[in-house]
Amino acid sequence: MLTPVVSYSTVKEVKGPLLVIERTRGVAYGEIGEVVGPDGEPRRVQVIEVGTDYAVAQVLGGTLGLPAKGSTVRFYGKTLKLPVSEELIGRILDGKGQPRDHMPLPPPEDFRDVNGEPLNPYSREYPEEPIETGISAIDGLYTLVRGQKLPIFSGTGLPHNLMAAQVVRQSTVRGSEEGFAVVFVGVGIKTEEAIFFMDEFRKTGALRRAVAVLNLASDPVAERILAPRVGLTIAEYLAWQLGYHVLVVITDMTNYCEGLRELSSGRGELPGRRGYPGYMYTDLATIYERAGKARGKKGSVTQFPILTMPHDDITHPIPDLTGYITEGQLVLSRSMWGKGIYPPFDVIMSLSRLAKDAIGEGKTREDHKDVANTLISAYSKALELRNLATLVGERNLGWRERRYLRFADAFEQRFIKQGYYERRSFEETLDIGWDVMSILPEDELTNARPQITQKFYRRHIFESIKL
């Protein structure tokens, strides 16, 4: 039980989720406390701005029914710390780290600051080991790497929630003696989405190795800002103290940024691009930069955040700033989804900057780089030929060009498309890749090494296709 250091009855204003407290002395940024209204109910607060004689605090429990007059704020002289334990695996929490599954919290093994402990840049290790998600488009083309931060850029109505649940259920680290865990963070999600995730995790057994932090759209906006930090604090404890490889899946970071804009507006700050605060880049970096590997530590923290692009605009400040901080992006395509292809990846717009160092012999398979480079290059050429075919007609194209059109169809329907409950290993993904690539003549596979093509090319597939 914390003992108050100082109390104030000088609440000037309650503005949205914020309290403005006058005549404060010695109150620190990030300090926690509680506000007690005339009804006697305590609510947790955290200081987010400090002036010469005032402080602004966000109320984590919401300000409904809380008047300025008659309210008392008590500060504890400490920052917000989260009780953590290995026994949190299998639990469902809210955005403040409190139980949402109606069970008591396990005895804490440690208390960790929710703002994290920044990794010394010198102690960081370069990520080089893959995570197998079981999804061919990710594993085959844009491999997720332990310690990487690789976001999904989605849009309203696209199946990013299905993908998040599938990644939580299927992801694994092969050939590692350390444990593997998933921390799932739902930020500002609707009640039906929360029910979907909870039911899915319980039904498939994914919760046995996962911690779920669910912040609902109806929860206070201040909790929305806290939820990703709660999830990452748990992930860091599992990784740095217990040696787990932790995959953190966060959805939806757009809701987080909207909450940030709401708090900024409530504080009367000058808006930046499209009304978002000018410090949004820095704020996002405090979340994304908590991913990584550290020298001397067995574990790792990998981030897989998901955001919905407003109006499918990839130049919007949220995806734009996210792209500057993270190491690539996986973009979902509305046109692919319209064709009935799941997961609907936009292969050309997607990128993983670290994938090249985590694949190949001794990590996945010797032909992995050849397959990835060839598939992307051939598909890019096939899309150009599709556009040409709409102008001149497919029958007016040469036989090689028609092969590319057949390749594009097979690539989308066999390689990219897979079932929601279908899990593919790296080997299965690469074998499907060769099946699809073998539709093309062998001399067209110029992005693959000759010795690799000679070993894996399926000539019988090429010969079986009649144009």
From Swiss-Prot:
Q: Name one GO biological process term.
A: proton motive force-driven plasma membrane ATP synthesis
Name the GO cellular-component terms: plasma membrane
CDD domains with a match to the protein in the record: ATP-synt_V_A-type_beta_C, ATP-synt_V_A-type_beta_N, V_A-ATPase_B
Q: Write out the entry's keywords from A to Z.
A: ATP synthesis, Cell membrane, Hydrogen ion transport, Ion transport, Membrane, Transport
Q: Name one Pfam family in it.
A: ATP-synt_ab
Bilayer topology annotation = Peripheral membrane protein
Q: Report the subcellular localization.
A: Cell membrane
Write out the ranges of the annotated region (Disordered).
Answer: 95-114
| Keyword Transport tagged | yes
The record's GO molecular-function terms, alphabetically, read:
ATP binding; proton-transporting ATP synthase activity, rotational mechanism; proton-transporting ATPase activity, rotational mechanism
Q: Which InterPro entries match?
A: ATP-synt_VA_C, ATPase_F1/V1/A1_a/bsu_N, ATPase_F1/V1/A1_a/bsu_nucl-bd, P-loop_NTPase, V-ATPase_su_B/beta
Quaternary assembly: Has multiple subunits with at least A(3), B(3), C, D, E, F, H, I and proteolipid K(x).
Q: Which family does it belong to?
A: Belongs to the ATPase alpha/beta chains family.
Role of this protein:
Component of the A-type ATP synthase that produces ATP from ADP in the presence of a proton gradient across the membrane. The B chain is a regulatory subunit.
Q: What is this protein called?
A: A-type ATP synthase subunit B
What gene name does this entry carry?
A: atpB
